[in-house]
Amino acid sequence: MSRIETIKQAIMMDPQNKAYTERGIEPLFAAPKTARINIIGQAPGMKTEEAGIYWKDKSGDRLREWLGGDEDTFYNSGLFAVIPMDFYFPGHGKSGDLPPRKGFAEKWHPQLLKECPDIELTLLIGQYAQAYYLHEKVSGKVTERVQHFKNYLPTYFPLVHPSPRNQIWMAKNPWFEAEVVPELQSLVQKILHR
């Protein structure tokens, strides 16, 4: 059994995840040893959990557009790790999905990241990933972080969530698709084709 498979089994056996395991739901993440880019989002949505494949929804389609890549490269190249703040759908809240469970990333991220020694860039999608990895307040402005993404390079690239629910944000911030997305695509392509 590989080290990643051992970690996956430990995640599934953890009491915090017992209810998911009993329902036949496996944790959604990918941590190939060959990964060069790590994608850290909030947690799988309900559709991705039902499909059993991370980023297999409209948000994932938009994310792949932003990266300038296709599904085959995203899922099968071994160049992308996907290690969200929670590996299970946390449920619905008043204005969207509930936040990732506290303590989840602290417990599992270090073990998985140790297995991915070649990560060159980590995409931090949304406020929870950004607050955790950039050590900033959750209430900090995602927009400001994304606008000033160069301040976090070469290690991190903060992004807004690619959800269709963010259409209003996209309309209010046209600089994102005009300036940030092309920079992201260029950087991702350089890393993938080294």
Model segments located where?
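Short amphipathic alpha-helices and their capping/turn segments at secondary-structure boundaries
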Residues: 24-33, 62-74, 113-114, 148-150
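Short, surface-exposed acidic-centric catalytic microdomains
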Residues: 53-100
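Glycine/proline-rich loop-helix segments at beta-alpha junctions forming the active-site rim
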Residues: 2-9, 16-19, 86-194
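Active-site and ligand/interface coordination hotspots across diverse enzymes
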Residues: 1-59, 185-194
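Short coil-to-beta-strand
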Residues: 33-41, 76-84, 154-157
